[in-house]
Swiss-Prot record:
Has a post-transcriptional repressor function in flagellum biogenesis. Associates with the 5'-UTR of fljK mRNA and promotes its degradation. InterPro entries: Flagellum_FlbT. Coiled coil: none annotated. GO terms for biological process: bacterial-type flagellum organization; mRNA catabolic process; negative regulation of bacterial-type flagellum assembly. This is Probable flagellum biosynthesis repressor protein FlbT. Belongs to the FlbT family. It holds the Pfam family FlbT. Keywords: Bacterial flagellum biogenesis, Repressor, RNA-binding. One of its GO terms (molecular function) is mRNA 5'-UTR binding.
Length: 149
């Protein structure tokens, strides 16, 4: 890390740091002086929120960050999922971004991958609402990724 990173948290807010979950009891500012892997609570997707193919991919990618002991399993599941999604989506913007997301995870930048996945949610919602991806395919993806839960 070339410079320090400062994060402000409100009372009761949680942050996931290197696999640990911290909750603060008052407004605090944290200053990270070295490299750290973290996720703010408002960016953590709960399993029940992983209801679409990209949200499932997001959930898996976040597990790479917040569960260091299971990183190898999470990464293997991510690889399987990204391969499946690349064969299922037809939208060029999503396909290009999925390839970039795969490269981000491959180079240890899962945090950046999460941000990129969130950026695709609106396009995915449009695709699913307009049935551009058959419901049977969405269900197949869900079943393939469901063992993760």
């Amino acid at each position: 890390m070339k410079s320090t990173l400062r994060i402000s948290l409100k009372a009761g807010e949680r942050i996931f740091i290197n696999g640990a979950v911290l909750r603060v009891d008052r407004k605090v500012a944290l200053e990270f002086l070295n490299d750290v892997t973290f996720l703010l609570e408002n960016h953590v997707l709960q399993p029940e929120g992983a209801t679409t193919p990209l949200r499932q991919l997001y959930f898996i990618a976040q597990m790479i960050l917040i569960n260091p002991e299971g990183k190898d399993h999470s990464t293997a599941m991510f690889r399987k999922s990204i391969t499946m999604l690349l064969s299922c989506f037809k939208n060029e913007e999503i396909l290009a971004e999925l390839k970039r997301i795969d490269a981000l995870v491959s180079t240890g930048r899962a945090f950046d991958a999460l941000k990129a996945i969130r950026g695709l949610y609106a396009i995915e919602d449009n695709i699913l609402n307009n049935h551009e991806m058959p419901p049977t395919m969405v269900e197949q993806i869900r079943r393939e990724i469901a063992p993760w839960r």
